[in-house]
Amino acid sequence: MEPSSDAPPFELDRFELVLLKRPTERSRISEEESDRLQALHLAHLHALTRSGAIRAAGPFDEQSDQSLRGMAIYQTGSIERTRELACSDPAVVAGRLEVDVMYFYCPKGNL
């Protein structure tokens, strides 16, 4: 079946995808410090979501690569700005998480 010539054009929106990963080497910290950093991490993500920089974020479960902890879809317009925001996360600053930033495309209007 051939595509219809009156089909709407397929357009993509561009976002920045941040993968949050557990570093291969990280020091042990107390449960209290871990809880404190987690609260600061969540507050950071919440503030970026409220500001509109993050469109969606959340943790992974049952992933094959246990170093992958979660992801966030940003819309800042640049990898550099997204990396700056992601690297200011208190859990990243403390060395508990690392970030991998890349562009992510999805059909226009899906997010």
Language-model features, listed with the residues they occupy:
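Conserved, structured core segments of small domains
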Residues: 1-111
